[in-house]
Amino acid sequence: SGLADAHRLAKSIPDLSLYHPWAIEPTAAIELATVCEAAALDHDPRVTNSEGASVSTSEGLRVYGNSHGFLGGYRESDHSISCSVVAAQDGAMETDYEYAVARDAADLPAPAEVGAEAGRRTVARLGGTKLETRTAPVLFPARVARGLIGHLLSAISGGALYRKSSFLVDALGKPVFASRVTIDERPHLPKALNSAPFDNEGVETTERRLVDGGVLGGYLLGSYYARKLGMQT
């Protein structure tokens, strides 16, 4: 497979503000989780039980080097608050959750906000009924939309394309979404969870448009599959 081409490697490592350590004591974290859970339970009397609330923090250091002379690294941090509860009505029970993740703990919403949203989401699931088969517009909430985009990213990945196991083989330049859909890859957004100055081969990350007005504009390829497919990483 070989290394990525030397001219594609990152020449500099920009500061993307990915590292914001959170020196929180365990007792303080427990207090935040308790506030979060209480807000969920207090949201509605139909919220009857909790599956738990959590507060977490992590720090990491990513370093990559190769025999082309590349050596780069950067620190990063992730902090989160989450809560999951159970609601009951007329003998039926539903479970849902809410969470928040940020590079900087100062950017997290208040624990009570996370808990209240967990309660709201759970109660909203009560009383649902099945629809008859129909053709109708569908509005996807952000949580579901992220999953749909995840399926797109899997379908345009090098391995799936090379094995021809993707439904988007030979789809470059063709419509794959409605014309109102545009999807950008923006790896240099400060504090963003997936921002990075280089990929896992040391290749410099760049902004690009994956879908433009519904038309597929690019694939996600590492060096190995890019060479197999006669394309660029």
Model-derived regions: residue spans:
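Active-site bordering "gate/hinge" segments
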Residues: S1-E207, D212-V215
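C-terminal, non-catalytic macromolecule-binding modules
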Residues: V215-T233
